[in-house]
Amino acid sequence: MLNTQRAQEIAASPIMANVTYQEVPIYIQHVDEQNETARIYPLDNPELEQDVPLSQLMEH
C-alpha cells in the first residue's frame, strides 16, 4: 500500500518505480491528496487511464 507522500514522490520522479494495481504494472500520472486517489494507467495500455484508491497500489 502506498501512502500519499510516497505516491507523489513516485509520480514526480523521472525514474520508473515498480508499482502495480491489481498485479498490473502501472504509471502514476497524478495524486489527489484530498481523495487519496491516483490517476494511473497500465504500462502496456497508456490509453486506459483511471482513478484508483492509493490503498490499492503496491510498490515492489
Swiss-Prot record:
The keyword Glycoprotein does not apply. GO terms for biological process: asexual sporulation; sporulation resulting in formation of a cellular spore. The keyword Cytoplasm does not apply. Coiled coil: none annotated. Keywords: Sporulation. It comes from the Bacteria. It is found in: Spore core. Induction: Expressed only in the forespore compartment of sporulating cells. One of its GO terms (cellular component) is endospore-forming forespore. Pfam families: SspH (PF08141). Belongs to the SspH family. NCBIfam families: PRK03174.1, SASP_H. This is Small, acid-soluble spore protein H. The gene is sspH.
